Amino acid sequence: MPFDLLAERKRWNAGYESIDTSSQKLTEVVTPITVTWENIEVKTRKKLFSKKQKQLLNRVSGIAKPGEMVALMGASGAGKTTLMNVLMCRNMKGLEKNGTVKVNGTKIGKEISLISGFAQQQEIFIPTLTVDEYLMIQARLRMKANKHTRRERVDEIIEMLRLQNCRDLKIGTPGLVKGISGGEARRLTFACELLSNPSLLFADEPTSGLDSFMAASVVQILKNLANSGRTLIHQPTAELFFQFDKIIFLSMGKTAFMGTPHESVKFFADCGHPIPKLFNPPEWIQSKLSVIPNNETKSRETIGKIIEFYEKSIIHQKSIVEIRVIATTELPPYIENPGFFAETGALLKRACLDVIRSPAQMRMKLIQKVVMGLFIGSLYWQQPLDPRGVRNTNSALYFLIAELTFSTMFGIMTFMEHELPLIAREYHDGLFYVISYYISRFLSYLPLFTIDGALMIVISYWMIGLNSTWQQVAKSILISVLVEQSATSCGLFLACLFETTSLAIAFAVPASGLFALLSGLYGNTNNFPVYIRWMQWTSWCRYGFEGLVVNQWSQVDNPKWDPFYRELILKQFSFNKDNYQLDVIGLCSIVIFFYLAGYIALFIRIRLSR
């Protein structure tokens, strides 16, 4: 059964005395955590037509104590990332794991996410927000505390991580939108994780891509965090080797060494691989622990001897004893989630700021609808009440429905593809429920995808010469809003269902064409084959077109017309003069259906993304 972090958080806190950590200063010593792992084995799962399994980790053991900054090092493919994922219980899809991970002597699984933070290598933010705004919203999601306490925590973190100079700058997107620097983005990643004041912090290559000065600055920050009693486990680069308290070298899925940096230099000298003068120790060590492509046999033999030497060493024996004698102590409680309404409010604020600060999309949609309203109104200017005018008026009504459908559906599809990685990360960090995000994003787009359609109807309405009583105008606007929301909800569903926008569009093009065909303009739907005819009731184009046509002609009073002429106008499309209310109900049903389907698709997609 999928792991629900938010539900588990409530269960976790129920077992411990309530402790308010929201007001605790970050510089104060936190609840100490000792992490141990013993005999960790990880293999790929057997596939249906293959019995081969790849061994990623083989009986790996280790320990990380409070106040220690532990570095996982090794060549590419050594098992560093796999071990990190095992300790965090993340990204284990398709893998089989054996062995135990303990925190303070207690066996632990996915609940470790409740007492730890994870600063990932890839920085993903909302680029339109400032650093201060982003941290305040993150604090609202991570802390059950009042606004004053959250403000103090954010100010403290900004000062600690030296983000004062960029607190009011927009985050931006590297290479696209000017914003904060790479070093500031890396520190912002740590700032988000520190908001909940965790005792255990994981970091994935925190200095990768930074210059030597910025890398040293980040490591010094990590060192300060470790000095306050936190346990830090991360994958570093090799430049700052001697800054770490403990080094764990991995090779071929096994532990080749665990100890202090100075002990590693002595260890490799003792096993026959002394580090030459003027050589960088970590680079030399990693060269000896790497499998060289053109000399694999000799490389594996050398690595095997180093691992064997380590397993027989006193350093290894001491670590095994240390792992097994750790006393069981109380685990720290995790800060309680602020709740559904608080997190939805925070996400709604974030989404609205993002929409407001992306004026290009708003401007283009409004301009598009104004231009199309003027174009359709000019094309069908003041149609007379004769047979030709009736046909032209019906065509104008259909083109209004088509414009509300196609531009809206394809316009909404682009938002999910770029935002999903951030949402998946935050969800798996336990910051919110999927429904909270979905509601907030839907509400943030609602005004934009409502006003523009109504504006187009208002512009073109009197230009075409439609029935202009206030009741008819209001009914037409209602139909336009519901048609646009139908297209919005369908586009949102497809964006949530498919991994890329191109796939969603590839499906939407024939689907929208079918909906348009079933509208009634291109043929009397009652004359369609029975196996196709039923599909008209799934088409919002059909409901919308009928609603506008019925609204236009059911109340027209022209003394030159035959008494039955109005009914003939409707009958050619298989429309009924009493169906306006049914059309509104049908459109509302489609809107509700696609919004619910979109939520289910997004929920499944995010849950499976771990």
From Swiss-Prot:
Residues 42-277 form the ABC transporter domain. It is a multi-pass membrane protein. ATP binds at G74, A75, S76, G77, A78, G79, K80, T81. The keyword ATP-binding applies. It holds the Pfam family ABC2_membrane. InterPro entries: AAA+_ATPase, ABC2_TM, ABC_transporter-like_ATP-bd, ABC_transporter-like_CS, ABCG_transporters, P-loop_NTPase. It is found in: Membrane. GO terms for biological process: transmembrane transport. The chain crosses the membrane at residues 396-416, 446-466, 477-497, 503-523, 584-604. One of its GO terms (molecular function) is ATP hydrolysis activity. Its main location: membrane. The keyword Ribonucleoprotein does not apply. CDD domains: ABCG_EPDR. PANTHER family: ABC TRANSPORTER ATP-BINDING PROTEIN_PERMEASE WHT-3, ABC TRANSPORTER G FAMILY MEMBER 28. Required for efficient RNA interference (RNAi) of pop-1 indicating a role in the germline development. This is ABC transporter ATP-binding protein/permease wht-3. The lineage of its organism: Eukaryota, Metazoa, Ecdysozoa, Nematoda, Chromadorea.
